[in-house]
Amino acid sequence: MAKYEILYIIRPNIEEEAKNALVARFDSILTDNGATVVESKDWEKRRLAYEIQDFREGLYHIVNVEANDDVALKEFDRLSKINADILRHMIVKLDA
C-alpha cells in the first residue's frame, strides 16, 4: 500500500460543527473508495502567504492515508475542488 499525506485549508469563519462535519465527510470519502485513514488531525489556524477568496487565514487539516490505488485520492481531489469550504488542498505521496 502506498502512503499519502493530504493537507487542506478550510475557510476560517466556518462554525465548529460544520468543520467537524466537513472533516468527517472527506474522511468517509477516502474510506468509502478503498483507502485507509491512518490519522486525521487539525493542525492549526495559520496566516496565509497571500489572500485566498478574501481570506488572510485558514484552518489547516492533515490526513495520512494508505491506499492501493488512486481512486479514493482522485475522488477526494474532485470533490475538494467543488467544495466552497476548502480553500486549497494538496496530496503528496510519501516515500515507502
From Swiss-Prot:
Q: Name one GO cellular component term.
A: ribosome
Q: Which UniProt keywords apply?
A: Ribonucleoprotein, Ribosomal protein, RNA-binding, rRNA-binding
Query: What's the domain of life for this entry?
Result: Bacteria
Q: Name one GO molecular function term.
A: structural constituent of ribosome
Q: Name one GO biological process term.
A: translation
Does the entry feature the keyword Cell division, yes or no?
A: no
InterPro entries from the entry?
Answer: Ribosomal_bS6 (IPR000529), Ribosomal_bS6_sf (IPR035980), Ribosomal_S6_plastid/chlpt (IPR020814), Transl_elong_EF1B/ribsomal_bS6 (IPR014717)
Q: To which protein family does this belong?
A: Belongs to the bacterial ribosomal protein bS6 family.
Protein purpose:
Binds together with bS18 to 16S ribosomal RNA.
Q: What is this protein called?
A: Small ribosomal subunit protein bS6
